[in-house]
Design a protein with these regions (language model features):
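Cysteine-centered motifs
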Residues: 15-17
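Positively charged n-region of N-terminal signal peptides that target proteins for export
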Residues: 19, 26-29
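Bacterial N-terminal signal peptides
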Residues: 31-39
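Extracellular ligand-binding/catalytic regions of CAZymes and related secreted enzymes
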Residues: 45-46, 88, 159, 262-268, ...
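Short beta-strand segments enriched in small/hydrophobic residues
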Residues: 46-58
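Helical hinge/lid and interdomain linker segments adjacent to catalytic or ligand-binding clefts
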Residues: 56, 60-153
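Catalytic beta-strand/loop cores that center a nucleophilic Ser/Cys/Thr
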Residues: 78, 82-85, 102-103, 179-289
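A glycine-rich, often tryptophan-bearing local segment used as a flexible ligand/cofactor-contacting loop or short
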Residues: 114-237
Length: 325
């Protein structure tokens, strides 16, 4: 029996008291858990995104207030979990001040005809933060020749080469030299040796000399005719592809054609094709030190590519995913 009566008093059985205490404890624990979940969600910090744009006059053919501002405004409208700053090459410190870079978790970079104006000091400020895992870098379209992107690809090429020869020449001393492409910002011909490439020769029984040919960061064909492309999701489970259909038509864009002279990416998210048979790996991710770089190909400043909702979804997804790393 749960109750015993003695001299007109009712005594509660100890087991019943324990059950009641356990029930009260569990309800309190559940309430506290819900409180902390709701509180954490309420105070979650937004991902801080710095949109960098070289700003050149031909952007006016498709964008009223610069391409970078268009991206920033549309990303801001996509959700309250993204905080935006839009900066430009002509801003103080080229928009790459310590204040901006220390604030940002992700940089989205648009550059085309003014790539060479970015100073070596600013390239280092960006790439050092990427390598340290303090900043992620998104290169758009013609930013395959952005100086921070090329610096990141050069770093990755050398890292891949060292890992390769450490594996294939265990215990041997290997010294390295690097060779840049024949001329900066030139287009490689079809049939060229794909870069990056690395070779080593034997100096003696214990040491080797290796040569690393750095990546061209370009491709043999391009066609700025505004013809449509089909963007196909190759990694449907990837966070960058969340909420997207399997295939997306880009009504107006410039064509790039493989092979793209870059290190082998860690992930390929999208592939783009054209009616004449060209193809391109149009969404790629590399691990660069402790950080990440994402290259997204569609574009050309004369076409309203970044007014297309799917393109903004991709940039928003990428920013959230990279910012959480």
């Amino acid at each position: 029996m749960a109750l015993r009566q003695h001299a007109g008093l009712i005594e509660t059985h100890p087991c019943l008291c324990l059950r009641r205490l356990h029930s009260i404890f569990m309800k309190t624990l559940l309430s506290l858990s819900l409180f902390f979940v709701v509180t954490s969600a309420a105070v979650a910090k937004p991902t801080r995104v710095l949109v960098w744009d070289e700003r050149q006059p031909r952007q006016a053919e498709a964008y009223d207030n610069w391409l970078g501002n268009e991206i920033a405004q549309r990303l801001k409208a996509s959700g309250s979990d993204l905080e935006l700053r839009s900066v430009a090459l002509d801003d103080p410190e080229q928009g790459l001040s310590d204040d901006n870079l220390n604030w940002a978790e992700v940089v989205i970079w648009w550059g085309h005809v003014r790539q060479g104006e970015v100073t070596e000091a600013n390239v280092k400020r960006v790439t050092d933060r990427v390598l340290a895992g303090e900043l992620a870098f998104i290169a758009l379209h013609s930013a395959h020749w952005a100086r921070p992107f090329m610096a990141a690809m050069n770093w990755r090429a050398q890292d891949d080469a060292r890992k390769h020869f450490t594996r294939t020449l265990p215990g041997k001393l290997v010294t390295y030299t690097t060779v840049a492409p024949p001329k900066p910002q030139t287009v490689p011909a079809h049939g060229s040796v794909l870069t990056p490439a690395y070779f080593a020769y034997k100096k003696n029984n214990t040491s080797f000399e290796a040569t690393i040919h750095l990546p061209w960061c370009c491709f043999p064909d391009y066609r700025p005719d505004g013809k449509p492309s089909t963007l196909t999701v190759k990694a449907p489970g990837h966070p960058i592809a969340a909420g997207l259909p399997t295939k997306i038509i880009v009504p107006q864009t410039e064509m790039y054609n493989e092979p793209f002279h870059v290190p082998t990416p860690d992930e390929v998210i999208f592939e783009e094709t054209w009616e004449l048979g060209e193809r391109f790996r149009s969404g790629m991710v590399w691990n660069i030190g402790k950080g990440k770089v994402f290259y997204f190909r569609p574009g050309h400043e004369q076409y309203p590519v970044f007014k297309q909702p799917e393109m903004i979804t991709i940039l928003a997804n990428a920013s959230r995913w990279l910012g959480a790393k």
